[in-house]
Amino acid sequence: MKFDKKIFFCHIPKTAGTSLRLSLEQAVGDAAVVPSQALISHHGGRYPPLHEALQELQDKPDYRLFRGHYGFWVRKYLPRNTLTIVVLRDPVARAISHIRHFLADGKTTEADALESLDQGRLPVPDNALCRYLGGAAIEAVGQELSARFLDSKSIPIVDHNDLFKRAILTGRSVDIMGFTDDMPALYEKISQETGLPLTMRQDNPSRYPALSLSDRQLDTVRRHNQLDLQLYEAMRAERNSNKLTRLLKRTGLYRT
């Protein structure tokens, strides 16, 4: 049966999502992707502000793939039966990769970043996984919508428990959840679900050398990403439990 759903790839930064994004774009064709490459190029090779991406959704109703560094709550703007995809990465590794990204872009220096970690401060936004999955819908339009969403990715978290609970519930609602350390399984799952001929790729490697962090510095990264660590472990545990259930059902050993 032909797959005719639209796809939303909630691309959380530094999760190896660029490789999947490019594979999906190749499979559906550039003309069926929002935000378009033209709009991305207009913004210097970066995803455009949210309100511009949503406007392009309205202008291209025949799109097949919507992807970007946008919160999962943006799904409310998409058709009800949209297929949702998310990739999670070990939160400590993801945060360190984000720091290297900041260094490569010149947003900070290595000396300043390491000093921040030594002093117990994280030089990048904390708990990105929970922010993207558990962030509350923003009721605004136009540039205000984009500005408030941008703020939501870095401002202090007001209610950690509430954010974590929403992230867990959202994670359970994702149609296809993958993990950076098992990308082949994710590609296989997407291909099975959509029939799209995906090609494994390795794109957008870090442009900054690996960092050698002390135990103290690593502890700072962990401490500031406790919500993400809990979310990551919970999602992996549920994935493994579901895999075991499917295996038992196939072997006839499953009992309700």
Mark where each language-model region is.
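PAPS-dependent sulfotransferase catalytic core
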Residues: 1-62, 98, 106
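Short, conserved catalytic/metal-binding motifs centered on acidic residues
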Residues: 16, 90, 228
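PAPS-dependent sulfotransferase catalytic domain
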Residues: 41-87, 92-198
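General alpha-helical segment detector with a strong preference for membrane-spanning helices
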Residues: 18-20, 94, 232
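PAPS-dependent sulfotransferases, especially Golgi type II membrane carbohydrate sulfotransferases
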Residues: 171-183, 187-188, 192-256
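A generic hydrophobic-helix recognition signal that picks specific residues
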Residues: 7-9, 83, 221
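A generic structural motif
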Residues: 34-41, 95, 200-210
